[in-house]
């Protein structure tokens, strides 16, 4: 059908990191569709139901051939069973950049950064941004806003700003346009 869901943004909160070997249960459910967007929650719980982490994600419905967002129709959404919207503090989808970010050393996108569509994998952007966290920084909340797709050989020019309890990283192209913006917060 020439359609795909592309992750636009997400907000992940980790209240407790499980110990190695802890049995966990992962849940996910879409909870709303609007225009060309779909919204989905995730949880990680212990087997007795204690919530360890939870997330919200926003997905854009695209035409694969053009990369342009396409309005959802009942044919696109009827097969989904909507779940309850998770009770959590929902952060805005867009991440505001501070004015005084510091440019960091640029690097080239390598093969190991790519997904099956030959673009940088969403999690790889998070790993790239983690390089700018102080060593003792324990992430409580991570937010990511995806703006453009980087491909093999593209140059990524990071900018970062550390504030009290927060680090913001913008992973830009050589013209200063962001591929992804990531915000990490401590508890």
What are these regions (language model features)?
Residues 1-9, 52-58, 63-140:
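Hot-dog-fold acyl-thioester-processing enzymes
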Residues 101, 105-186:
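Acidic/His-leaning functional-site neighborhoods
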Residues 8-14, 26, 141-146:
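Short structured motifs
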Residues 13-14, 19-96, 150-155, 161-187:
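HotDog/MaoC-like acyl-thioester-processing domains
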């Amino acid at each position: 059908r020439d359609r795909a869901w592309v992750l636009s943004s997400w907000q992940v909160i980790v209240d407790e990191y499980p110990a190695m070997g802890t049995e966990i249960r992962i849940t996910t459910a879409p909870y709303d569709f609007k225009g060309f967007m779909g919204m989905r929650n995730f949880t990680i719980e212990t087997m007795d139901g204690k919530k360890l982490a939870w997330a919200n994600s926003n997905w854009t419905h695209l035409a694969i051939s053009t990369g342009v967002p396409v309005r959802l129709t009942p044919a696109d959404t009827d097969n989904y069973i909507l779940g309850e919207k998770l009770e959590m503090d929902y952060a805005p989808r867009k991440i505001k950049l501070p004015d005084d970010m510091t440019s960091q050393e640029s690097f080239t996108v390598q093969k190991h950064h790519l997904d099956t569509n030959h673009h940088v994998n969403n999690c790889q952007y998070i790993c790239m941004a983690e390089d700018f966290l102080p060593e003792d920084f324990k992430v409580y909340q991570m937010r990511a806003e995806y703006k453009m797709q980087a491909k093999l050989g593209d140059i990524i020019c990071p900018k970062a700003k550390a504030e009290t309890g927060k680090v913001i990283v913008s992973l830009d192209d050589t013209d200063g346009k962001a591929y992804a913006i990531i915000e990490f917060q401590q508890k």
